[in-house]
A protein has these predicted regions:
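Bacterial N-terminal signal peptides that target proteins for export
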Residues: 1-8
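C-terminal segment of classical bacterial N-terminal signal peptides
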Residues: 13-21
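Enrichment for repetitive, rod-forming helical segments
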Residues: 9-12, 152
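Gly/Pro-rich, tryptophan- and cysteine-flecked surface segments typical
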Residues: 20-157
Length: 157
């Protein structure tokens, strides 16, 4: 009798398929990074800023970029969907080094210098940022240090 029960249990386990986590695009947003030293001048060869973010949450998520001027006024608020294990590239300025998923826009054509907050529907993402020369095919620039908020549980950053 035990052999029959074990056979049934083994058969049941053989047909169970692993599934990805359900989409979390409706979860509340949490701030995951803040970067200062963000710079951009649209329509110019002046240095711009590029952000790369990767989602490893196991679900589709939403990522938001809220930029502020030197004086603290909101200069932009942009949202982008991001799939599991997808890397997105977001830029201020005319960066040609990378293919771009989202060009951040400014309310005017003035030089933008300030900070940006990155929020997402999951903390299971990581982002980097660089101020780069805009007319270069090779990445020429400096890395910006991001302050991490809401770290991934069980990680050290």
């Amino acid at each position: 009798m035990k052999a029959i029960h074990w056979t049934i249990a083994a058969t049941a386990f053989a047909f169970v398929q692993p599934t990805l986590a359900s989409a979390a695009t409706t979860d509340p947003e949490v701030i995951i990074y803040r970067f200062n030293g963000v710079r951009g001048l649209l329509g110019s060869a002046a240095p711009g800023t590029v952000f790369h973010c990767t989602n490893f949450s196991g679900a589709n998520e939403m990522i938001r970029f809220v930029s502020r001027t030197q004086s603290g006024e909101i200069a932009g608020n942009h949202v982008l969907p991001i799939s599991h294990l997808q890397t997105v590239t977001i830029v201020y300025g005319n960066i040609i080094t990378y293919s771009v998923d989202l060009h951040l826009t400014l309310p005017s054509a003035l030089t933008f210098q300030g900070s940006i907050a990155i929020a997402a529907t999951s903390a299971n993402m990581f982002c980097t940022a660089m101020v780069m020369e805009t007319a270069e095919f090779a990445p020429v620039g400096i890395a910006l240090r991001g302050i991490r908020f809401n770290p991934v549980p069980g990680s050290q950053e």
